[in-house]
């Protein structure tokens, strides 16, 4: 068991003499701790990229598309159309802007708590997507009109016969789908794999 944990990156707490019951040394724990830090760096890198892509796209949409006719991307099947959405992802729950702001803040806190024990690269990517998307929409809710914690999110990706959304929504959905897949495969954020 200790060998499997060493391979997948779960450090054990070493005993006073520098080895744990499975024979791993304090050096093994230090190497594994380094692997964990790299996963946090991966999470933060994915989050920053997702956040900056979302922020940049929204700035461009507000500057170039707001109060303009939609732009056809793939005929009328996919358009770019600027709207302000006070609700959640895909226009759901417009009357609960403050509640969605609180939920997004809670999601960010939970991600940072999970990140402390993160030893799985796929989980780092999934959580990074969630974090970047949550921060992107939270930024809109805090800084855009009509007011702090009540701001409307800028949405612009408009598939035919579907809700309008943005890159933050896409990152959140992709991160959520990846988490479901990882959970079904039995991979935990700490890198352990279990068979049920």
UniProtKB/Swiss-Prot annotation:
Record field: transmembrane: 40-60, 92-112, 118-138, 164-184
GO molecular function terms attached to this record: aspartic-type endopeptidase activity
Gene Ontology biological-process annotations: proteolysis
Domain of life, per lineage: Bacteria
Active site: 155, 169
Reaction(s) catalysed by this chain's protein: Release of signal peptides from bacterial membrane prolipoproteins. Hydrolyzes -Xaa-Yaa-Zaa-|-(S,diacylglyceryl)Cys-, in which Xaa is hydrophobic (preferably Leu), and Yaa (Ala or Ser) and Zaa (Gly or Ala) have small, neutral side chains
UniProt main location, coarse: membrane
Subcellular localization(s) per the UniProt record: Cell membrane
Entry GO CC: plasma membrane
Pathway stated in the Swiss-Prot or TrEMBL entry: Protein modification; lipoprotein biosynthesis (signal peptide cleavage)
First-tier enzyme category under EC: hydrolase
InterPro entries in UniProt: Peptidase_A8
Function, in words: This protein specifically catalyzes the removal of signal peptides from prolipoproteins.
Record-stated family: Belongs to the peptidase A8 family.
PANTHER family: LIPOPROTEIN SIGNAL PEPTIDASE (PTHR33695:SF1)
Protein name per its UniProtKB record: Lipoprotein signal peptidase
Species in which this protein is naturally found: Streptomyces griseus subsp. griseus (strain JCM 4626 / CBS 651.72 / NBRC 13350 / KCC S-0626 / ISP 5235)
Gene label: lspA
